[in-house]
């Protein structure tokens, strides 16, 4: 079962995709709408797209993940199909506080898809598994570090 974005976001992204197909650009009014819905994350996501920071990693089995090089220089792994990002902002603002719909990395993925500005990397199934396992270990390590600091 796919996780759906709120209808207003789906509609906005659909209108933006249609504008890109028709004129190869996004009109200012749609960019203003994007900023209204996502706040400062919209500008930050567009900056990530402009810097070509989004990479789609795919394997022969059809598995797909995205990696986004964040503005801090860290790389975050994202699963667009279930709206997940490994960044701290996603965990805190999207999951815990529910005050954001998406983090800037996920928004950058959706924007790079519609602007056709996404890097492509094809890897073996084993390489993709290793990448995901490494990311999982990194997240667990960071969570363990965070937990031990808060318990002290």
UniProtKB/Swiss-Prot annotation:
InterPro entries: Znf_SWIM. GO terms for molecular function: zinc ion binding. A zinc finger (SWIM-type) spans 76-114. One of its GO terms (biological process) is double-strand break repair via homologous recombination. GO terms for cellular component: nucleus; Shu complex. Keywords: DNA damage, DNA recombination, DNA repair, Metal-binding, Nucleus, Zinc, Zinc-finger. PROSITE patterns: ZF_SWIM. Transmembrane segments: none annotated. It is found in: Nucleus. Belongs to the SWS1 family. Involved in early stages of the homologous recombination repair (HRR) pathway of double-stranded DNA breaks arising during DNA replication or induced by DNA-damaging agents. Required for meiotic progression, hence for fertility. Interacts with RAD51D and XRCC3; involved in homologous recombination repair. Interacts with SWSAP1; they form a functional complex involved in homologous recombination repair and stabilize each other. This is Zinc finger SWIM domain-containing protein 7. It comes from Mus musculus (Mouse). The gene is Zswim7.
């Amino acid at each position: 079962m796919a996780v759906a974005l709120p209808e207003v976001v789906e509609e906005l992204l659909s209108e933006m995709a249609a504008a890109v197909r028709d004129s190869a650009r996004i009109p200012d009014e749609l960019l203003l709408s994007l900023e209204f819905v996502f706040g400062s994350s919209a500008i930050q996501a567009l900056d990530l797209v402009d810097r070509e920071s989004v990479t789609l990693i795919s394997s022969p089995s059809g598995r797909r993940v995205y990696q986004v090089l964040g503005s801090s220089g860290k790389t975050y792994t994202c699963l667009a199909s279930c709206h997940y990002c490994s960044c701290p902002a996603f965990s805190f603002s999207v999951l815990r506080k529910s005050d954001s719909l998406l983090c800037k990395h996920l928004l950058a993925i959706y924007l790079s898809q519609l602007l056709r500005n996404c890097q492509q990397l094809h890897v073996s199934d084993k390489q993709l598994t290793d990448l995901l396992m490494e990311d999982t270990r990194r997240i667990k390590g960071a969570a363990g570090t965070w937990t031990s600091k808060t318990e002290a």
